C-alpha cells in the first residue's frame, strides 16, 4: 500500500514572487529528471551497442519517455514512484537516487533491470537531473528576461529626449533623460541575457571515483567508456562533459552566477521603479496591481516589491554555491554537494518568478513625462550648475559663483542682474534639456552599436540632431574649467 505523501511545506505563502512560476523546479519535475537521467544511461549503452536496443525501448516505454509531445507536468514518467516512500528512504543514504533505483527496477522486465543505473554513481544521476531541471527552467527565464529587456529598450527609445533629473547619492545632480535611465535598465538585462545564453549544461557520468573504471569494464574498452558520457548527454538532452565534474563545480557556480546577475539587473529596475514611483516624485507608476488593505488611495508598486525581494536574496544563495564548490573535497564531496541542491533550486525558483514579474512590469510601466520635467526644475536652475560653473567662473570667479548658487531668490533673475553676464542667454543656459550630453544617443542605443571608427561620428551626428552642440564645450569653456572631471 502506498505511503502517505509528504506534507507540502512551501506552496509560496511566504514567497509571493514565485507563486505560479515555479512548477519547473518542483519536486515532481526533479523526480521526472532523475528518471529521465536513468533512462538516458540505458539509451547510451544501447547507442554504443553495449546494451540491446530493445532494452532501451522497453525502459523508455515503461516510464513514458516514448510518448512525444506530452509536457512533463502532465505526463511525468515518475508517476508510478511512491513519493512518500522515496522521501523517507532518501534519508538513510543521504540522497534520493539510491532508493529510486530499486523502485525503478521493480517496474521494468527482469532482463532490463541489470541496465538500470549500471556503473553509475548517485552523483552522476543527480547532477545530470539538476542540469535537466536547470535547462528547462532557464528556457523560461530567458524568454521572460528577453521580454523585459525589449520593453525596457522600447521605453528608452520612446523617452530618449524627455528630460529628467539624474540623482547621485540620492540628490539631484545634472540633467539626463528618462530614456537614458531606461537604457541603463535595458543594458543590464541584455548583459544578463548574454550570460544566460553562454551557459553550458553538461551531463555527469564518471562513476564512483571519477575514473570511469566501471564503464571500461561494462563496455569492454577504454574507447567505448570514453564515448559513453557524450552518448549519455545526447540521450539526456544535455551538453557533453569535457571531463568529470564531481568536485570541479563550475557548471553549478556558473549557472548560479548567471542567475544572480539576472536578479541583479532586475533588482536595479525594480529599485528605480519603487523610488521614482514615490508619491512626492511620481515619475513612473506600475500599470498593474498594487492595492492596499488599509489605505485605498495607495497604488503600491507590487511588481517592483516582489522583484526586489528576489534580488535581495540571490547573492547569498550564489555565495553558498561558491562556498560549496570550494569545499568539494577529495573525489566526491561530503555535504558540500548536498548543500547545492536546495540552493540552486531556490535561485532558479526566484529567477523564474522575478523574470516573469519584470516582463509584466516593463510592459505596463507608465512614465509621467511632465512630472519628470517638473522635478528637474525643483532646484530653480541649479540642476545645470556644472554647466554654469564653466560659463561663469571665468567671468566672476569661484567665490562669487558659489555665493550666487547659495543665495536665495530666483537664479535666472540673479543671473540677469550680473553685469558680467549681460550677453548671456539665461533661459538657454538654464534649460536642463540643453545640457543632457549624450543621454539621447545613449537612450537610442548609441553606446551599444558596433564598435569602430564610426562611433565618434555617429555620436556627433546624434548630438547635432538633438541640438546638443548649440552651446558646445568650446563656447563656454567647460573643458578648460574642469567641468568634465
What residue ranges belong to the model's regions?
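Long, intrinsically disordered low-complexity tandem-repeat segments
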Residues: 465-483
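Intrinsically disordered or highly flexible coil/loop and linker segments, enriched in small
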Residues: 47-51, 110, 158-161, 241-242, ...
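Long, low-complexity hydrophobic alpha-helices enriched in A/L/V/I and glycine
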Residues: 163-166, 240-243, 380
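C-terminal catalytic subdomain
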Residues: 312-322, 333-413
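Charged, flexible cofactor/metal-binding loops and thiol motifs
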Residues: 127-135, 141-142, 150, 157, ...
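A helix-coil-helix interface module used to build multimeric assemblies
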Residues: 1-212, 224-231, 292, 304-306, ...
